[in-house]
Each structure stands twice: as structure tokens, then as C-alpha cells.
Amino acid sequence: MKTKFFFISCICILAISVSIVACKKSNRTVPVQLLLTDNPTSYDEVNVHILDMKVKMNNDEGWTDLNTKDTTVNLLDYQNGLTILIAEGEVPEGTLKEVRFVLGTDNNIVVGGITHPLQTPSAEESGLKIKIDKHLEETLNTLVLDFDAALSIKEENGNYKLDPVIRWNP
């Protein structure tokens, strides 16, 4: 009888241990870096002021800030396969759902040698969001974000507005 009770107790303890381990959230992180590139366009320059880059994982814990240098990037300097590192960091393992660009106010476009302000209506407040939905591996995860300047710029009566068209290359 004692042997049967001992055996059943061991089975119960094992089952409880397995269920606790299976339900425990992983605290592991994986490395990620974001690169930026652009398609060719006829503008002289398209300068975008990047303040911050954030990612959202599938764990619903909100946005994770990446290491981002506050910088202004001429998108046209990164065409035909050229890229620039704009952010990197460690994020919780899992599936990367979204990337968010947070832009500053120093955005402009140069057309025919003349600099014009580039309006970015929501990008300075809520940021530009890109849906990704990519499972991240334990090794370095590099995502190339293609910011299409030609399709993103809208001109009306001499005013230029940024309506971003950003794709990522899986």
C-alpha cells in the first residue's frame, strides 16, 4: 500500500512539475537589427529625422525600444542594395509583430536644389507602423526595411507630405 501511495505521489509531483515548467514564460531574448534602404527616385534628397525605433512582439507586453541613434537620414543615399543600420537590440524571443518608426521634426525634401519642409502628420506622435509577423531565431535577426521615397512623397501646391510606403524584405 505504501509503495502504491509513493508511486501515485511521484506521478502527481511529476505532472505538477511538468505543467509549471510548461506554463512558465520564457525570459530569453534574441538579437535583432533593423536596416534601411530605398528605391530610386527623381528627388535630390529626402531627409527623414529618426528619433526612435520600437518593436512589438506577440507577447502583448507593449512596445520595446531598440538602441536607436537620433539621426537624420537621406533615404536616397541608400539605394540599389545599400543599407544603413538604424536600430538594434535584444528583444523577447517570439514573433515580431510590428516595427514603429518615431520621427522628429527635421524632415525635408530637396527638389531642384530647393529645400522644402516635409510634413509628417502622425509620424511625430504615434510613429509609422509596419506589420512584420516574423518568428525570430536565436541568431542575429536582420530585417531590411525598404522606405520607398518615390511612393511616399505627396506634393500639392508646393507643399510636400510624407505618406510612408515601407516594406520589409523577409
Language model features: what each stretch is:
Residues 24-170:
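A short, solvent-exposed, low-complexity linear motif enriched for acidic/polar residues
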Residues 9-17:
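Bacterial N-terminal signal peptides
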Residues 18-22:
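C-terminal motif of bacterial Sec signal peptides marking the signal peptidase cleavage site
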Residues 1-10:
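Bacterial N-terminal signal peptides that target proteins for export
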